[in-house]
Amino acid sequence: MAFSQKLSLRAYSFSFKKWKGKNPEQTLPLNAKVIFNRLQDGEERTYEYTSAFDLIVDFIGANMDVDDKEVRQQLFNCSFDSTNQGEKDTYRYLIFTVYAGYYGYASKLVNRKTKSTVHKKSRDEADVKPFYVVVVIPKDTEISKAQRGLILFQEIGIYGVKTVTTKAMQEFF
């Protein structure tokens, strides 16, 4: 019997908070205008988004090129096809792909059938794997403003991208 990698989704809720120093001041509505300052090219700039959804789309766009997270010896980037977003009566969603892999150690790839080495991986090569990420943001209702969304991370066996993705989001936001 062949062993197969366990494919799964792990779900998390998320919110955006306005911070004053080190303390969260308030939770922000996800479907309201978002304005914040961010350093870019050594200069502080003001960014305005119509909602958290658009902020996340901008995060994906800003991470299309491969980023070398040298401290963690990890490569990271995203891809997104605008056809992988949409909305239903009660929520909006988008699906994007995160590519991540570690480098920093040499190893070899061995063909399991022939038992022969097919490639010798150098310390500068990373085994980059694709993972799907799904973001769901509820729409506001007459009696309630959405303050929490849902984010689903695909996992393949022991591999996943939650930590590298959320750290990149924290750096971006």
Language-model features and meaning:
Residues 1-140, 147, 155:
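Intrinsically disordered, low-complexity polar/charged tails and linkers
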Residues 159-173:
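A short alpha->loop->secondary-structure connector
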Residues 150, 154-161:
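A generic structural motif
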Residues 107-109, 151, 164-166:
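Generic detector of ordered, mature protein regions
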